[in-house]
């Protein structure tokens, strides 16, 4: 009888998995984006060391992806309690997977665009604006996942 009111004992497992998925997948995307963009910056800085600070933008944008996952993971962790329902814990799992997997995809996109964009900007500075626009569109992919995750986790 208490199971219907509070949910089964294993219900919190799914919410914890949602928090873990949010952090792990978004951090993987951010790490890939940082590493891929960072190698492009390192290669470019040999030829054009004066452009290092201008080229750091993809690395910063990749790091923001991890912050999205952190926000959702903290929201999920703060909403955990002993009597969480199975419905609520599945919502938390969905929220974590939403922000995590969209962060992974956004991190991959930011890394690839950042690497090619930084190398191209070193040779042709007019490519900088185009690189920034493409990076913004890649970052928005992670933002969409964050919005869906916030809607799910606060439901």
Curated annotation (Swiss-Prot):
It is a multi-pass membrane protein. GO terms for cellular component: clathrin-coated vesicle membrane; membrane; synaptic vesicle membrane; vacuolar proton-transporting V-type ATPase, V0 domain. SUPFAM superfamilies: F1F0 ATP synthase subunit C (SSF81333). It is found in: Cytoplasmic vesicle, Clathrin-coated vesicle membrane; Cytoplasmic vesicle, Secretory vesicle, Synaptic vesicle membrane. Expressed in brain (at protein level). Residues 1-10, 77-92, 153-155 are lumenal. GO terms for biological process: pH reduction; proton transmembrane transport. The record marks 139 as: Essential for proton translocation. This is V-type proton ATPase 16 kDa proteolipid subunit c. It comes from Bos taurus. The gene is ATP6V0C.
């Amino acid at each position: 009888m208490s199971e219907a009111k509070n949910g089964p004992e294993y219900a919190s497992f799914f919410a914890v998995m949602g928090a873990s998925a949010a952090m792990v997948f978004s951090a993987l995307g951010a790490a890939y984006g940082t590493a891929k963009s960072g190698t492009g910056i390192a290669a470019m800085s040999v030829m054009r060391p004066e452009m290092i600070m201008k080229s750091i933008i993809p690395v910063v944008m990749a790091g923001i992806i991890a912050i999205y996952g952190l926000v959702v993971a903290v929201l999920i962790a703060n909403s955990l309690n002993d009597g969480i329902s199975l419905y609520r814990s599945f919502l938390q799992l969905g929220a974590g997977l939403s922000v995590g997997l969209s962060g992974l995809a956004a991190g991959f996109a930011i890394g690839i665009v950042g690497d090619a964009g930084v190398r191209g900007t070193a040779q042709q500075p007019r490519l900088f604006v185009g690189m920034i626009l493409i990076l913004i569109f890649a970052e928005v992919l992670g933002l969409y996942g964050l919005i869906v995750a916030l809607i799910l986790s606060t439901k």
